[in-house]
Structures are given as C-alpha cells and as structure tokens.
Amino acid sequence: MRALVALSLGLVALAGCASAPRLSPTLGQASTGERPKVVGSHGALSSAQVKALTARLSLEPGDNALLKRHMAIEQAVAESPLVAGETTHLLRDGEATFRAMFAAIGAAKHHINLEYFIFEDVESDGVKLGDLLLAKRGEGVAVNVIYDSFGSSDTPTAFFDRLRQGGVNVVEYNPMNPLKSKAGYSPNDRDHRKILVVDGAVAIVGGVNLSTTYQAHPTGKSGSPPGEPAEHWRDTDLEITGPAVARLQHLFFDHWREQHGPELQDLNWYPAIAPTGGAAVRIIGSSPDGATPLYYVTVISAIRSAEKSVTASAAYFVPTPDEMDALTDAARRGVEVRLLLPDKSDSPNSIAVGHSHYADLLAAGVKIFETHDLVLHSKTVVVDGVWSAVGSSNLDHRSVIFNDEVDAVVLGSDTAQELEAMFADDWAAAHAIHRTTWSQRSLGARAKELYARVWEMWL
C-alpha cells in the first residue's frame, strides 16, 4: 500500500512540487521562567495548581525542571491546549487496540465516531466490526465514519454500503474519483489519522489502522498474500479518558464539515467531562491546509531542546533536513539518541531512503536498531523521560507535506516510563546497526539508496 501511495500520488505531485518547510534555528526557544499554561475541565489552572501538577508528574527531582522546560517550549509552538485530568493507557499492537476499541464501542450510549486511513471489517474475539457497529446503531446509538479514499481503496464497496443501509453515516475522505469530490480535488491530501471517539468521553488514537494485517489470519486485501504466513505488525495506540477527548472530537467534526458530511443531529457531542486521572495531554492535529505543520514543529522543538535522551520509533523513516539536523545535533551535544526502525516494510523504497541516512546518523553518535521478524508500524517518541508522543505521524516528508495527521503528546514521567518499557522489549528483539559494518555494505545497496532518494518527498 505504502509503495503504491508513493508511486501514484507522487506522479501527481510532480506537477506542483512541495517540500517540507525549513524551520528557524530559534524555533521553540522559550524562557524557563515563562509559566506553563494548562487547562482543566473547569478552565485554566492557577499557578499553584500547575506547580502541583508538574510535581506530581515528575518521578525524580530533576524531572520537574525538565518537565517545566518542555511545557514552556511546547507552549511556544503548539496551538492546542495542554489539558490536565486525563487517564491514559498504552495499547501494544492490534490485538490489544481492537479489544479496547470493541469494548468502548460496545459500551457506547450516545455516539461512536471513527476516522481511519485504512478501514476494514476487522474482528476481535470473534466479533466483526461491521456487525458491532450495526448492532449499536440498532440500539439507537449514532455511528459516524470517515475513511480515507486511497487508504481504504482495497475495502469492498459492499462493506460501506452495508453500513449505510444500516443507518451508519459514512463519509469518504477526498475521493480518488474527481467526479465524487466535494471539497476540491486534491489526491495527495490523505487522511492518515486514526481516531475513535465514544460518547465524547473515551478516545483511542495512534498508529493502528482498522486493518486485518494485525490479525493472526488476515482476511482483507491489506494482509499477507494468500498462502503466505501472516507477519506480525508492531504498533502502538493510546486510550484517553478525560477532557482532552473533546479536542479529538473537534478534529473529527472539522473533517466531517470539510468533506460535506450529512448534517448530524445534536447529540451532546461535547459533554462536560470531569477529571479522570493525573495525566496532562495535548492533542495536535496537523493538516497540509494549515500554515504551520503543528506536530512537526512540536516534535522538532522537543528534540532540539532535549537534555538527556531521545527515543523514537517510525514505520517510515524518510527524514526531512530539519529532522536529520535535530537528531544529529542532539547526539553531538551528548544526548542519547536511539531510533527503532524497520528492516522490512510494505514500502521497500522508504527502507532504502532511511538506509541512505544511516551513515550520517551513526557518525553523529545516533544509535540505530532495526526490528526483524515483524513489520514495525509504531510512531512514538520519548524525550528526557518526561515528554511522550503517540500518533499517526512518521518521521517523513509525507506526514509534513501531504497527510492530515493526529498525535497525542503526554507530559509526565509515568507514560514516558511505560513507553520506555515497551522500547526495552523492542530493543531485545532488534539488532543494532554498527558504523563499521554499515560502511561495508555493497555497492548494489548504495545504488538502491541513491535511486530511492529521488522519490523521498512522496514516500
């Protein structure tokens, strides 16, 4: 799928080339004395409440200062609020995500909103998603679906027709057929988001598509070819309960209106949600229509300001110049920078482009680990043990230039420690790339890397 995106959409883009914006070297600089701004379910938190929050989110005395620094820097570049009072739960791989999704959908009382790049009739514990959604619709629960036209091009039309006939509102995002487009024909603008919102109170966001690739025995066309064993897909999602869910709801309805979805009955889409936990979350929606690629700016500013460590995973590592500079500069100033990257992918060219950057990364001191015996699809970042991100954005050009993305930034030590524990498991199953052996790779491999670089903007 990824290779097909690059080929077909990349050819279209040649007529009007775009590139990732170069960011100012001073981006994200903020005074450490600037008071972080945090909102709760009843509005802005006081200085005393913010102070108590940062103390609670820090496990070590030194973490408090790091946390305040990252809060101030992120505040200078992000346009969405940092929301306190959240409960977050990391979900490892498709099985855990689908189980959490199906549980939330099954408990829905008012509405279910789903927005996914790939939307297939996945199942969990023997229950099909389509059957569950239609059953909830039969109970009077509103069900609204946005699926990306390109990402879900392999999903049978009959599946969406069945949902519509059962009363589910279905919107096709940026139809590949220009005759069906309602918001202007822009085939390169793809909805890469993965969002579930239930009753305006619970949400799941991250890298997991509604794809049968995550199942032991894939049934959709996005899975392994017939007769071939299914490959394990490694991915990460985040379940959020609390006031920050409203931001994901806003993003969903922004796309619904943009794509001229049918007018919906007011079902209390934004209920008053009391604090459910102690996490602080910032939801960042990015779009090529915006003047600033918000998550891109945020993650680069976080890496540029790192003092101790940067740990990141990416399904498609096709770094922009600013991403390369941020990673190598951090390593050169003594920050431990570790990257978890795939050695196999549904986009071989993205692997080749990533490989073309390894020499510079290794020379700067970046530690690179490649997974094996699985397909890495996770997009996560941890900085200084206090700043964490889980979402749909990769370290690539497409996430900046063409895709609509959504990422959740969680501030505090607890989530960072959970993610680091996941990384520890991943390191154990990965192999390290060493500078000496990497320099001895074949001329054929180097030639493949150079060729793939021609297409890196669209990968």
Residue ranges and their predicted role:
Residues 1-7:
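Bacterial N-terminal signal peptides that target proteins for export
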Residues 18-459:
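Charged, low-complexity intrinsically disordered terminal segments
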Residues 8-10, 340:
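Residues within alpha-helical transmembrane segments of multi-pass membrane proteins, especially transporters
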Residues 13-16:
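C-terminal motif of bacterial Sec signal peptides marking the signal peptidase cleavage site
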